[in-house]
UniProtKB/Swiss-Prot annotation:
Disulfide bonding pattern of the chain: none
GO cellular component, one term: plasma membrane
Entry's family note: Belongs to the ABC transporter superfamily. Xylose importer (TC 3.A.1.2.4) family.
Listed name of the protein: Xylose import ATP-binding protein XylG
Keywords: ATP-binding, Cell inner membrane, Cell membrane, Membrane, Nucleotide-binding, Repeat, Sugar transport, Translocase, Transport
Gene: xylG
Lipid bilayer topology: Peripheral membrane protein
InterPro entries for this protein: AAA+_ATPase, ABC_carbohydrate_import_ATPase, ABC_transporter-like_ATP-bd, ABC_transporter-like_CS, ABC_transptr_XylG, P-loop_NTPase
Single GO molecular function: ABC-type D-xylose transporter activity
Catalytic activity: D-xylose(out) + ATP + H2O = D-xylose(in) + ADP + phosphate + H(+)
Superkingdom, taxonomy of origin: Bacteria
Length: 518
């Protein structure tokens, strides 16, 4: 019998004559966790679709050996029956069904006569959650009543119920808090000890280093290296991913911070479901010309609600004033904000940033389409010229501006959303989690773009859950805690510990080393 549970040898997958995968080799042993790393568009998702038979046998070249035997699956159900289960970044749970019903979806236990055996499913679901160290979870409740971390565990329980021997986790922590991530990594360690193998796909290389035994890097559809994690470190992984050494993960463009041009006054946001509860409580701050202002805070602190209100996109009731260049401006709707010179790249690009049914170019010019129209027709040549310039400026990888935007990787979709907002020529640009789900190379390009925009005099407000990112690119940092301003710091020798201390504080007076900005 082979020492390997899985062997993928010489995998080649082509689309229209273009090789998306070009001779990929991957091996996984029982109880081993393999980190699969690469930039967006490198071929990670395509490789996993080959493995799980989304692309069935016969549509690709090479061989897959499972327990030493050829695997020629024609459907996902065949690979799941073999013990290969993928947990996608976008969870597949049905919100209104119970935890137990979600775990058994498609594999329901029945009584004679075909009726559902709910007691047996409840008992088995409780057993699975105990196995995952969540003994107090009420499996009879709708899964929607649990947060993202618990829902991720339900997906794992669902996979284990299918007798998974190889668990493929695609960006499993993208919507989790730090404590939920730690629970997830502990569970993966437990599964490894029981002989369950894992493929861990993530841009968060600290997680890869913490849980993986080996790391396989692919770049431009080719296998670059597979190395024991003990012989690797994060800078080496990054070098293999991008094909060059990156000495500075947070590049800075020289830029001058000028006079105050933007002011948020007494911004208060009320909860959508409970209008008496304040999600943001009387927050005021200033922003200078060419300044990059980072907004930090714990999950649920109110950061997204704050910037959504500034842009006129908060769905609930809110109050306060927004001033630009010494005058109050109308930001009650996104359109009015854009016309006033305030633009925002939202946190959830798939739901709020792109129109999936439109092409790359159409998404880029969507916010300024009227500028190409003379009431009777659209100047297609002028529009295409703008699209080509933005694609070039953003280093956006696409074979054609007419391709569906959904054909792009996450990083390139984000660049398209940025290009759309930049075509409006904003004076204030709000970025909410601009690098979430984006690979290290695309992150680097986004940071460089932010610096270049600041050098041109654009003022930037950036919300990020990654403290290292906030400290790496910001001139000044605001800290939000429980909907209130807890700190306002000039980013000079500022530490993560200082930011966290401010976020966790309950003082009425905010921590402040930036009084001279007032």
């Amino acid at each position: 019998m082979s020492d390997y549970l899985l062997q993928m040898n010489g995998i080649v997958k082509s689309f229209g004559g273009v090789k998306a995968l070009n001779g990929i080799d991957i091996t996984v042993k029982p109880g081993e966790c393999v980190g699969l790393c690469g930039e967006n568009g490198a071929g990670k998702s395509t490789l996993m679709k080959v493995l799980s038979a989304v692309y069935p046998y016969g549509t690709w070249e090479g061989e897959i050996l499972w327990d030493g035997q050829p695997l020629k699956a024609q459907s996902i159900s065949e690979t799941e029956a073999a013990g290969i289960v993928i947990i996608h970044q976008e969870l597949t749970l049905v919100p209104d069904l119970s935890v137990a019903e979600n775990i058994f979806m498609g594999h329901e236990l029945t009584l004679p006569g075909g009726r559902m055996n709910y007691p047996a499913m409840m008992h088995r679901a409780e057993s699975l959650m105990r196995e995952l160290k969540v003994p107090d979870m009420n499996v009879a409740l709708p899964v929607s009543q649990y947060g993202g971390g618990y829902q991720q565990l339900v997906e794992i329980a669902k996979a284990l119920n299918k007798k998974a021997r190889l668990l493929i986790l695609d960006e499993p922590s993208s919507a989790l808090t730090r404590s939920e991530i730690e629970v997830l990594l502990d569970i993966i360690h437990d599964l490894k000890a029981k002989g369950v193998a894992c493929v861990y796909i993530s841009h968060k290389l600290d997680e890869v280093a913490a849980v993986c035994d080996t790391v396989s890097v692919i770049r431009d559809g080719k296998h670059i290296a597979t190395t024991a994690m003990a012989d690797m470190d994060i800078p080496k992984i990054i070098t293999q991913m991008v094909g060059r050494e990156m000495s500075n993960l947070y590049p800075t463009e020289p830029h001058d911070v000028g006079e105050v041009i933007f002011e948020a006054r007494h911004i208060t946001c009320y909860d959508v479901d409970n209008p008496r509860r304040k999600r943001v409580d009387d927050v005021s701050f200033l922003l200078r010309r060419g300044e990059i202002l980072g907004i930090a805070g714990l999950v649920g602190a109110g950061r997204t609600e704050l910037v959504s209100a500034l842009f006129g996109a908060y769905p609930g009731r809110y109050s306060g004033e927004v001033w630009l260049n010494g005058q109050a401006i109308d930001t009650r709707t996104p359109l009015k904000s854009i016309r006033a010179g305030v633009c925002m790249v939202p946190e959830d690009r798939k739901r709020q940033g792109i129109i999936p049914d439109l092409g790359v170019g159409q998404n880029i010019t969507l916010a300024v389409l009227d500028s190409y129209s003379n009431m009777t027709r659209i100047d297609a040549e002028a529009e295409l010229g703008s699209i080509d310039r933005e694609i070039s400026r953003m280093h956006l990888k696409t074979a054609s501006p007419f391709l569906p935007i959904t054909s792009l990787s996450g990083g390139n979709q984000q660049k398209a959303v940025l290009a759309k907002m930049l075509l409006t020529r904003p004076r204030v640009l709000i970025l909410d989690e601009p690098t979430r789900g984006v690979d290290v190379g695309a992150k680097y390009e986004i940071y460089k773009l932010m610096g270049a925009l600041a050098a041109e005099g654009v003022s930037i407000i950036m919300v990020s859950s990654e403290l290292a990112e906030v400290l790496g690119v910001s001139d000044r940092v605001l800290v939000i805690g429980d909907g209130q301003l807890r700190g306002d710091f000039i980013n000079h020798d500022l530490t993560q510990e200082q930011v966290l201390a401010a976020a966790l504080s309950h003082s009425d007076a905010p921590h402040n080393n930036a009084r001279k900005t007032a």
